[in-house]
From Swiss-Prot:
Species the sequence originates in: Ctenus ornatus
Compartments where found: Secreted
Keyword Cell membrane: no
Entry function: Omega-agatoxins are antagonists of voltage-gated calcium channels (Cav). Toxic to mice by intracerebroventricular injection.
UniProt GO cellular component terms: extracellular region
Family annotation (InterPro entries): Omega-agatoxin_II/III_CS (IPR005853), Toxin_34 (IPR013605)
Free-text note regarding domains: The presence of a 'disulfide through disulfide knot' structurally defines this protein as a knottin.
Protein's name according to its UniProt entry: U4-ctenitoxin-Co1a
Disulfide bonds listed in the record: C2-C19, C9-C25, C18-C39, C27-C37
Tissue specificity statement from the Swiss-Prot or TrEMBL entry: Expressed by the venom gland.
Keyword Secreted recorded: yes
Highest taxon listed in the record's lineage: Eukaryota
């Protein structure tokens, strides 16, 4: 099952299994820590 745009995703994975082809996992973070990871879509 894919993750809808705006839903939480696993920040440890480059591919967040978004439903959109250009989807990726966008996280807030600092010093290697990640949080508030959600599926976002790129401009490509």
């Amino acid at each position: 099952s894919c993750i809808k745009h705006g839903d939480f995703c696993d920040g440890d994975k480059d591919d967040c299994q978004c439903c959109r082809d250009n989807g990726f996992c966008s996280c807030s973070g600092i010093f290697g820590l990640k949080w508030n990871c959600r599926c976002d879509v790129g401009t490509t």
